């Protein structure tokens, strides 16, 4: 029996020739503003976003409210000459106000530039000097802009303005992303595509991520980072109820999944590991989940197998890409069990080539630098303050990741070239050592760095987050099950928590500096 959509239940007729079930128009391509209007027409009083702050105070906004508020704020932007060609810096935490602001920016046809609300003053100054934003949404005051509105002030800006959406505008470029990279200097990356989705893109996203229409979705990453941003706004585009929380401790996330009967979640492997190691966690805790999509780092085979056992292989999705959008692979759990350790095959007409230091393609199973070409429909990006990536013959580019392919073209990730350590003349991938350490039941997180050493060049040093100190010999004995001897750290250091960014990635440079300062 056909299950009626929200629009059909409310008496609105949908065009059945569109995959986009909310598309009430005639064009296959729909902007975020127009899609928000369509969804709000279909289910105006349904909940669009639920937000819980660190004290668990709950705020809710309906689809009708989200559409009206973002339209009113868009009119404020337009009246202040913010539109196509303008850049709006946005520094709110994950919040309803952040969501309203982004839709308003796109409705005005402007470019959205997210940045951490915890950014240092020097970083904000660097961003402004490089990008020259026209306006900002932030709790701090940024001089030299047309305006800088706080979360409270955006509601004041809405007052007295039209509730109707401005004429549909294409935001192109639609977004400027930040990548810290390994250089220590921020890279600003512009997405040069009109903001919106067509049926092919929505269908591809759904197949790659496991996301469906009108699901309950939990966001556990920052909106200023690529993967959580895509998951959040693609989810809203598909009519999902988006649940935001500022309390990202594993126990709270588990409670949120159960309380809100979450159906879709995107996570980084670090969080997957912390959730899996919660005492008493079991299948019943994730009974509502229909899909878990993981990105943003290496998920070790043993950890992935734990989640396959918890959810079932057909509910686990993995995507591999990067802020520069040079290519894309994906794999689902039931395919992964036949190719354990793989991060998938190229999507669509994307291609992968593994090359040596001279740029020559290597044979299957031989480790080299990962070069990729992007699908024709993929995001077109460019560095604003950095030299463009070198383009090899055939359009192949690389961001410095290391890996190999098997004979069937499945890609396997080893590490970032910058994270490869040379110790005693041997190449050691930090990720491989960290993966082995995390198998130990009491270790919650681990980062391996190379301490300068007169004898070895770099001495392997493991920084470990755990609730108790573990004897070094016990750890070395454990690691011998999984690593050849030269890959086992010479020294270990135990800390209460490991420094990671909001995107879940370890700040290796800072961790190494701290270790050296402490005499590691």
From Swiss-Prot:
Pfam families: AMP-binding, AMP-binding_C
Activity regulation note: Inhibited by diphosphate.
Catalytic reaction(s) noted: cholate + ATP + CoA = choloyl-CoA + AMP + diphosphate; deoxycholate + ATP + CoA = deoxycholoyl-CoA + AMP + diphosphate; chenodeoxycholate + ATP + CoA = chenodeoxycholoyl-CoA + AMP + diphosphate
Pathway assigned in UniProt: Lipid metabolism; bile acid biosynthesis
Induction: Induced by bile acids such as cholate.
PROSITE patterns xrefs: AMP_BINDING
Stretch forming the signal peptide: none
One Gene Ontology CC term in the entry: cytoplasm
Thermal behavior of activity: Optimum temperature is 50 degrees Celsius.
GO MF term (any one): cholate-CoA ligase activity
GO terms under biological process: bile acid biosynthetic process; bile acid catabolic process; lipid catabolic process
Top-level taxon of the source organism: Bacteria
Entry EC no(s): 6.2.1.7
Cofactor: Mg(2+)
NCBIfam families xref list: bile_CoA_BaiB (NF038344)
Function: Functions in the bile acid 7alpha-dehydroxylation pathway, which forms secondary bile acids via the 7alpha-dehydroxylation of primary bile acids, and is carried out by intestinal anaerobic bacteria. Catalyzes the initial step in this pathway, i.e. the ATP-dependent thioesterification of primary bile acids with coenzyme A. Produces AMP and pyrophosphate in addition to the bile acid-CoA thioester.
Family indicated by similarity: Belongs to the ATP-dependent AMP-binding enzyme family.
Subunit comment: Homodimer.
Descriptive protein name: Bile acid--coenzyme A ligase
Gene that this sequence comes from: baiB
């Amino acid at each position: 029996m056909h299950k009626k959509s929200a629009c059909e239940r409310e008496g609105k007729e949908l065009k059945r020739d569109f995959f986009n079930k909310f598309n009430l128009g005639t064009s296959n391509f729909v902007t975020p503003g127009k899609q928000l209007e369509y969804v709000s027409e279909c289910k105006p009083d349904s909940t669009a976003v639920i937000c819980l702050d660190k004290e668990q105070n709950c705020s809710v906004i309906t689809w009708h409210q989200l559409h009206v508020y973002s339209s009113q704020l868009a009119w404020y932007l337009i009246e202040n000459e913010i539109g196509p060609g303008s850049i709006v810096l946005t520094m709110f935490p994950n919040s309803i106000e952040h969501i309203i602001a982004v839709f308003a920016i796109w409705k005005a046809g402007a470019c959205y530039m997210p940045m951490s609300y915890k950014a240092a003053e020097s970083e904000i100054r660097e961003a402004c000097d490089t990008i020259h934003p026209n306006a900002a949404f932030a709790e701090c005051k940024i001089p030299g802009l047309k305006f800088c509105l706080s979360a409270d002030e955006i509601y004041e800006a809405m007052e007295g303005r039209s509730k109707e959406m401005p004429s549909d505008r294409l935001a192109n470029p639609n977004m400027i992303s930040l990548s810290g990279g390994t250089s220590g200097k921020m890279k600003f990356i512009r997405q040069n595509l009109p903001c919106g989705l067509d049926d092919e893109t929505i269908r591809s996203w759904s197949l790659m991520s496991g996301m469906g229409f009108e699901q309950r979705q939990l966001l556990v990453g920052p909106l200023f980072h690529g993967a959580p941003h895509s998951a959040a706004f693609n989810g809203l585009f598909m009519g999902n109820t988006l649940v935001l929380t500022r309390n990202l401790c594993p126990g709270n996330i588990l409670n949120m999944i159960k309380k809100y009967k979450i159906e879709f979640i995107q996570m980084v492997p670090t969080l997957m590991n912390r959730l899996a190691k919660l005492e008493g966690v079991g299948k019943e805790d994730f009974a509502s989940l229909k899909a878990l999509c993981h990105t943003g780092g290496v998920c070790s085979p043993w950890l992935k197998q734990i989640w396959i056992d918890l959810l079932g292989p057909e509910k686990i999705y993995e995507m591999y890409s990067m802020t520069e959008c040079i290519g894309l692979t994906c794999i689902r759990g039931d395919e992964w069990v036949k190719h354990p350790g793989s991060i998938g095959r190229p999507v669509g007409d994307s291609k992968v080539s593994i090359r040596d230091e001279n740029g020559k393609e290597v044979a299957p199973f031989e480790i080299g630098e990962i070069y990729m070409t992007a699908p024709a429909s993929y995001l077109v990006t460019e560095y604003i303050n950095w030299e463009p990536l070198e383009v090899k013959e055939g359009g192949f580019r690389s961001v410095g990741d290391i890996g190999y392919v098997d004979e069937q073209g499945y890609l396997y990730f080893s590490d970032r070239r910058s994270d490869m350590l040379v110790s005693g003349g041997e190449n050691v991938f930090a990720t491989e050592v960290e993966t082995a350490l995390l198998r130990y039941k009491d270790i919650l997180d681990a980062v391996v760095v190379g301490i300068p050493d007169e004898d070895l060049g770099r001495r392997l040093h493991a920084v470990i987050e755990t609730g108790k100190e573990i004897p070094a010999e016990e750890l070395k004995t454990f690691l011998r099950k999984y690593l050849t001897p030269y890959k086992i750290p010479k020294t270990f250091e135990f800390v209460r928590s490991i420094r990671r960014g909001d995107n879940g990635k370890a700040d290796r440079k800072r961790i190494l500096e701290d270790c050296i300062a402490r005499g590691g």
